[in-house]
Amino acid sequence: TRAIRGVRSYPSMLDVPDEVDLAVVIVPAPAVPNVVGQLGERGVKGAVIISAGFKETGAAGAKLEADTVAIAHQYNIALVGPNCLGVINTDPEVRLNASFAKGTPAAGNIAFISQSGALATAVLDYAKGQDFGFSKVVSLGNKADVNENDFLYHLWHDPDTRVILLYLEDLADGGE
């Protein structure tokens, strides 16, 4: 193993000796399906795909995204993204920042779901100087697998969330 800025790193998911609950994938888009396959072989059940270069780029990217989702479904992996900022949970028992946001926001009772990573970043930056915080922050990106309906259901039942902010560019399944 090697270390990057003091953190152990591995050349492949298959080389990681520990159990992995959630993977944050930030590799070039063409490498994502292979990485998701490795996650499946390791039994990982959740992944945040931050990488861009999927359906937002056209037909070839859309096929790459569909292939990635098919591999994830084969292994029962829930995917957030691709092309997203990531996810944040401010619960002190969890304290997860699986994103490339600059820092973790203050804890609060507002959940924020945004399809746009740029808007999520702007809202998080604005919130730093204000008197409110977030319970959860989710950037959906392309919504290739997990979508706003999945998160809305979870957040509706989340005791740490009293308000849900939502920014969407489209609805995954309006009838749901």
Each predicted region: which residue ranges?
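Catalytic-core regions of core metabolic enzymes
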Residues: 1-176
